[in-house]
Amino acid sequence: MRAADLGNVPLQFKAKVRIGESEIARRWVPVRLPLWNIVLSGYPASGKTMLARRLVSDNANFVRLSVDDLRGMFYGPVQPPKEEEFVYDQLAALRDLILRSRRSVVLDSTAPRNSTRRFLLNTRVEGVVRLLVVLLVERSELEGRNQERGLVGAVDAWNRTWENPQTNMPVMKFRNNSLAEFETSYYVLTDLLRSKINPYRRRFIAHLFPKIRDAKS
């Protein structure tokens, strides 16, 4: 390949080898990006869809799967609770199909219970890094956002079903009380996704479970 062709090659496939001040060779090293299965969990209006769409927009290797979108595709505006198991089974099948194609997945779901979180996190595809991202918003802010949507009482309703994540789950806290806080949390998350070593190193400890305050407080 000619040197003039280098500009057309993705950056992740370029590697420069230097000795002293002179560049003596260029080696083409295929760098496999980490494969992620990211599950979002949070109250209504906590910013899950906003985060999922941002991840897909900023990362060409990510695909967003939404429980609500899939349910709507099958059943339209009606949401039959008895068919939830079918919806989640189809979601898991789509997730694994995408992961096998070597693309990362972000699952846009409320996932208030640990049983649902475990189901969405677990995959038979090998070499996948799992992460549960819990979006945290103060109760007063949540109530204001839901009132704007016409969902009065949504926070109280979700308080009855919400469970804090188990300590053995790979969890990151994502605080989203304001746009500025969203951007700060997003910076930490993207830094974590690009990490080439164990993501649970010291610099990320402050953003990890178990010290999570939910909307009940």
Write out the residue ranges for each language-model feature.
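N-terminal pre-Walker A segment at the start of P-loop NTPase domains
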Residues: R2-W28
